[in-house]
């Protein structure tokens, strides 16, 4: 009976974990879809009904043996996640810059914050003869926060205060952008000592 109930719950819960959360821009043209697929944070982006970004993963690779979370085994923030919490909100303000070509700038977006949980168990340390030691359970949380504007999106990673992710170094950001076409990309050079570089 217990096995049958567990199977039924699995069949109910599994499709829910695969369902994507849809967030639209204020005018509805930009559509973000976010889900956790096989433990990996994944998003897509559409504009006016056409795909712009195909399914792309998000995550961070941590530098090995560099963070000081006590008793923490090395594990990057790439996979093994479940969706723990979702929050959506709308923000709309108009502000005036001190200098620039535009007098009023409107900051209007819909926001979506996904709190992700990463859980695992580590092997117990070796005890004295006859001593039984239990596996240690670990849990970490990160937040991926999206802002969906009428002309695009932005996102960032946030790290709530927690013992399992207390101090760490990020070796590489693994945010993916699987563009749906052969697009032209614009970026700023990585010269962090000056702001005089032109956008390329």
Name the predicted role of every residue range:
Residues 1-5:
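Positively charged n-region of N-terminal signal peptides that target proteins for export
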Residues 22-200:
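N-terminal accessory beta-strand-rich subdomains and adjacent acidic, glycine-rich linkers
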């Amino acid at each position: 009976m217990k096995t049958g109930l567990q199977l039924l719950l699995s069949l109910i819960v599994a499709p829910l974990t695969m369902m994507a959360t849809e967030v639209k821009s204020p005018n509805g043209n930009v559509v973000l879809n976010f889900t956790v697929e096989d433990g990996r944070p994944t998003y897509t982006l559409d504009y006016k009904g056409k795909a712009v970004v195909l399914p792309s993963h998000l995550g961070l690779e941590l530098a090995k043996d560099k963070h000081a979370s006590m008793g923490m085994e090395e594990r990057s923030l790439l996979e093994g996640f479940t969706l723990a919490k979702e929050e959506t909100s709308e923000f709309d303000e108009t502000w005036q810059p001190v200098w620039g070509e535009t007098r009023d700038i409107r900051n209007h977006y819909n926001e979506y914050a996904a709190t992700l949980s990463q859980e695992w168990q580590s092997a117990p340390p070796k005890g004295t003869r006859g001593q039984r030691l239990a596996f240690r359970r670990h849990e970490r949380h990160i937040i991926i926060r999206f802002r969906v504007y009428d002309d695009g999106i932005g996102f960032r990673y946030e790290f709530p205060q927690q013992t399992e992710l207390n101090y760490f170094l990020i070796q590489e950001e693994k945010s993916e952008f699987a563009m749906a076409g052969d697009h032209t990309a614009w970026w700023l050079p990585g010269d962090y000592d000056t702001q005089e570089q032109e956008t390329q």
